[in-house]
C-alpha cells in the first residue's frame, strides 16, 4: 500500500513543502530508492538496437523508431496518470513527466549517435524554462536549447533537425533555439525572457563539455551583471501580467498561474532571488534566508504574494548597490 503525501512527510527528513519545490529531484530520489519506475531506459536502448540491426531502409527504420517512441510515451503517461489518481501528488507527476521526456529524448539522441549519424553529438541539448526547472504539466510546452559548438557544421544542423522532427512527429509541442555559448550570453543580455529561461537550464543529452561550458559561462556572466536591472524588469513584467488578468487577488474565477498571487508570482520571486544572490538552486534561496516565510514552511496568511514581496524587498536591498539606488515599493502593496 502506497503512502499518501502527508504520510510520506512524517517519515522524510526533508519537509514535504520543500520537496514540492524541487519535483525533478523529488522523483529522482524516488527512482534511486526503487519507489517509482518511469521508463526502462535499458529496454528502450535494446529495442532501438533491434530496429537498426535489421536490413530495413532508413525510412522504415525511422518509422519503427517513431512507433516505438510513441508506445513508450503513451505507456509512460498512462502510468503517470494512474499514479496521480492514486496518490494525488501533483509534484510527483510534473517531476516524473519531465523525467519521462528526458529519458525519451535521451534515447532518441543515443539512437541518432549510434545508428543514424554514427558520431557523437557535438552540441549540448539543454532543457530550459519550466521544463528545465523539472516541472512538466500534461500539456506543457517542451522548451529546448541546442547549445552548438563555436564552429558548427552542416551535420550538426542535420542532427538537430532529426531530433526536432522526431519530437514533433510524436505530437509534442516543442519550443526550441540553437545558439552557441557566446550567442546565448549575448541574447540573455538583450532579452529578459531568454535570461530568465537560462536561469533554469539543465543538460539532457549531448556533449557534456559544451553543457558545462554553457553553465559556467552563464554563471560567470551573471556574477558581473547589475541585479537591479533584472529585478526591475521582472517586477514590471509582473505588473503587466497582473493587469492582463484583472489586477485583483479577489477574482471569482482567478487564474491560478498568472493571476495576482498565483504560481507565476512565486516563480518570479525565485528567479529574482537566484539572479540577485547568484544561486543555482531553489533550495539555496531558502538556505540563504531570503524568503523567510517559506523557510518557516508557510506562506503569509493573505491569499497573495504581498507578504512574500515585503520580506523579499527588504533582503534585496543588499544588492541594490549594483543597480538602482532604492527598491521601489512593490505594486502588490498598493
For every predicted segment, state its role.
Residues 2-334:
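A nucleotide- and high-energy phosphate-metabolite-utilizing enzyme signature
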Amino acid at each position: 500500500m502506497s503512502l499518501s503525501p502527508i504520510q510520506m512527510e512524517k517519515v522524510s527528513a526533508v519537509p514535504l513543502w520543500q520537496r514540492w519545490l524541487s519535483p525533478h529531484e523529488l522523483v529522482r530520489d524516488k527512482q534511486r530508492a526503487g519507489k517509482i519506475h518511469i521508463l526502462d531506459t535499458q529496454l528502450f536502448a535494446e529495442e532501438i538496437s533491434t530496429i537498426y540491426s535489421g536490413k530495413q531502409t532508413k525510412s522504415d527504420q525511422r518509422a519503427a523508431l517513431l512507433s516505438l517512441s510513441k508506445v513508450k510515451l503513451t505507456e509512460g503517461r498512462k502510468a503517470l496518470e494512474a499514479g496521480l489518481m492514486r496518490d494525488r501528488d501533483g509534484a510527483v507527476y510534473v517531476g516524473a513527466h519531465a523525467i519521462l521526456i528526458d529519458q525519451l529524448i535521451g534515447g532518441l539522441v543515443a539512437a541518432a549517435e549510434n545508428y543514424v549519424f554514427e558520431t557523437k553529438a557535438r552540441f549540448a541539448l539543454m532543457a530550459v524554462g519550466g521544463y528545465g526547472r523539472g516541472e512538466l504539466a500534461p500539456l506543457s510546452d517542451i522548451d529546448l536549447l541546442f547549445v552548438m559548438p563555436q564552429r558548427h557544421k552542416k551535420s550538426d544542423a542535420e542532427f538537430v533537425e532529426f531530433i526536432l522532427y522526431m519530437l514533433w512527429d510524436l505530437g509534442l509541442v516543442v519550443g526550441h533555439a540553437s545558439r552557441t555559448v557566446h550567442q546565448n550570453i549575448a541574447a540573455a543580455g538583450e532579452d529578459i525572457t531568454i535570461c530568465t529561461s537560462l536561469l533554469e537550464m539543465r543538460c539532457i543529452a549531448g556533449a557534456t563539455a559544451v553543457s558545462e561550458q554553457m553553465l559556467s559561462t552563464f554563471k560567470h556572466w551573471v556574477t558581473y551583471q547589475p541585479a537591479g536591472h533584472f529585478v526591475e524588469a521582472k517586477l514590471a513584467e509582473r505588473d503587466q501580467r497582473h493587469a492582463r488578468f484583472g489586477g485583483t487577488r479577489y477574482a471569482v474565477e482567478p487564474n491560478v498561474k498568472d493571476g495576482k498571487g498565483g504560481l507565476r508570482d512565486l516563480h518570479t520571486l525565485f528567479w529574482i532571488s537566484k539572479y540577485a544572490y547568484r544561486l543555482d538552486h531553489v533550495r539555496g534561496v531558502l538556505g540563504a534566508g531570503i524568503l523567510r516565510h517559506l523557510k518557516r514552511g508557510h506562506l503569509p496568511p493573505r491569499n497573495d504574494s504581498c507578504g512574500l514581496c515585503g520580506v523579499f524587498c527588504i533582503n534585496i536591498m543588499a544588492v541594490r548597490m549594483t543597480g538602482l539606488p532604492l527598491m521601489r515599493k512593490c505594486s502588490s502593496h498598493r
